[in-house]
Amino acid sequence: MTPEEYCQQKAASSGSSFYYSFLFLPPNRRRAITALYAYCREVDDVVDECLDPQIAATKLVWWRTELDRLYAGKPEHPVTQALLPVLKEFALPQEQLLEIIDGMEMDLQQTRYLDFKALSLYCYRVASVVGLLAAEIFGYTDRATQKYAHDLGMAFQLTNIIRDVGEDARRGRVYLPIDELQRFNVPVADILNSRYSDNFKALMEFQIERAEQYYAQAMSQLPAADRKAQRPGLVMAAIYRAVLNEIKRDGCQVLSQRTSLTPIRKLWIAWRTWAKG
């Protein structure tokens, strides 16, 4: 299996909405974004799949060293081997790839966030940085597109947090800011024990509204000249906003279920959004 095939398999097997946003890209950009996505999946899987935090931390140290090897032109892992030509073509900075690992380390070090400012740093590292790297691969002419990519990454991660409240709680994680739980009078124990209430629904409606604000802010900052190049992000936004709408329609039942779209619906949204440009 070639490094490119490894990355393709990693992307396709994840079932992620990201995969659908890559489908219509020209081959060189599709290979590049698939390699970047595979890298994100690899370091994310370290945290999700390692039951021992010390082992996970050791593996993340290995990935830091592997990035040094990558930027020295001597990568060992199939994903970084696939990334090597990407670095040369799109000049992706090592600091940003390292920041993604910083975000994963936050998952090993804390399971709660005091306020939205603290959560925003996490979202920046695990999502906005990915958006900024992806924007480089898709291409842009106006630096304002970086602001769009940053806010779109925030919107995506906030959507993930909303969708996965119950799933994360079963792992002992609550990403919703503590001060907001207090404001809406929702005890952490209610989330950890999947106790649904009107207060919890109001809290989640607030979270959804904030995510929507980030989507709107991102779209308002995307320069018209770069809209065509940045269509993969628009595809992702359309899919993720459809998930948010489903969650709202179901009354924010995120403690007991994980809302997702069928592959055919994702494909339809992707095709429709791409065709609209």
Residue ranges and their predicted role:
Residues 1-157, 162, 166-277:
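Catalytic cores of Mg2+-dependent Asp-rich isoprenoid enzymes
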